[in-house]
């Protein structure tokens, strides 16, 4: 009997031990489940926070984009108004022009204004070939047709050029003037500019520069570095603007520009025309490059 009681007590002890282990395992699983639920809650909260951050960022980005687009629109309107004022002023410049004094049209009459220049449109080239290519030609380009120049055509050629690219004189001559329209009318017109009078009755204007390396009255040789390209003045991106004009039609004037503020003048090269012959002082650079 004693032996049976000892065996029964042993079985009872094993049963209690098994139940204790089961309870411990159950509690561990319960704790694990609670921990998992906690992790899921944290993950869910994190996802909600991420979503909220994303929505907030998207909202901020949209607001900033809206502000940016509004600034662009205001700047375009300012430039269009200033171009209208410049055009009105240029219409008052009456000069006598003799086309026979101009050099014959031909490739190489003027040197390229940038290193590695190509006269093809950037849009027609592969990205790898888009070095200092043409972003806008002379005359009534699509951009001009959009009203960017208040009904006028583009008075020069635009070349793609990274900020700091050397700008080269298109021929031998003398630096007639330099200036910076940003000092008088920020983010409008040429920005930093150089006017060079050449020896063949042509003059060239270089605009949107980031630096000017020459002084007024200085003689320059063909392909000599005269400045650095940039995006000063009114520019949607870094580029060089090159204007070619008949020397007799070019003058540097300072005149009131309401666009720039009350009682403020803007100083820059302007180009007149011959009312008798109808010849414009602006020339297509492609005829001489």
Which residues does each PLM region occupy?
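Amphipathic alpha-helical segments with strong coiled-coil propensity
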Residues: 1-58, 62
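Solvent-exposed, polar/charged alpha-helical surfaces in well-ordered, non-transmembrane soluble domains
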Residues: 10, 17, 24, 59, ...
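A generic local structural motif
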Residues: 12, 120-121, 228
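Extracytoplasmic/periplasmic cell wall- or extracellular glycan-interacting regions that localize
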Residues: 66-198, 202-207, 211-216, 243-289
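Glycine-rich GHKL/ HATPase_c ATP-binding element in histidine kinases
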Residues: 238
């Amino acid at each position: 009997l004693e032996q049976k009681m000892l065996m029964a007590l042993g079985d009872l002890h094993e049963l209690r031990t098994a139940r204790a282990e089961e309870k411990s395992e159950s509690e561990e699983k319960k704790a694990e489940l609670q921990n998992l639920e906690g992790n899921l809650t944290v993950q869910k909260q994190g996802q909600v926070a991420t979503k909220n951050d994303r929505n907030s960022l998207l909202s901020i980005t949209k607001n900033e984009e809206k502000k940016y687009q509004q600034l662009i629109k205001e700047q375009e309107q300012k430039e269009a108004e200033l171009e209208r004022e410049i055009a009105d002023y240029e219409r008052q410049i009456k000069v006598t022009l003799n086309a026979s004094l101009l050099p014959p049209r031909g490739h190489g009459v003027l040197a390229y204004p940038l290193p590695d220049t190509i006269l093809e449109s950037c849009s027609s080239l592969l990205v790898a070939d888009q070095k200092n290519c043409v972003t806008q030609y002379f005359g009534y380009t699509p951009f001009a047709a959009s009203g960017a120049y208040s009904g006028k055509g583009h008075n020069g050629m635009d070349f793609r050029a990274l900020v700091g690219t050397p700008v080269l004189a298109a021929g031998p001559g003398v630096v007639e003037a330099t200036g910076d329209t940003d000092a008088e009318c920020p983010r409008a017109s040429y920005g930093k500019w150089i006017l060079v009078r050449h020896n063949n009755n042509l003059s060239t204007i270089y605009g949107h520069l980031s630096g000017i390396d020459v002084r007024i009255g200085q003689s320059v040789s063909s392909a000599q570095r005269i400045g650095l390209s940039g995006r000063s003045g009114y520019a949607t991106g870094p580029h060089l603007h090159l204007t070619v004009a008949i020397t007799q039609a070019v003058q540097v004037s300072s005149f009131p520009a309401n666009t720039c503020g009350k009682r403020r003048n803007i100083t820059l090269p302007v180009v007149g025309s011959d009312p008798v012959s109808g010849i414009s002082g602006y020339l297509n650079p492609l005829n001489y490059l």
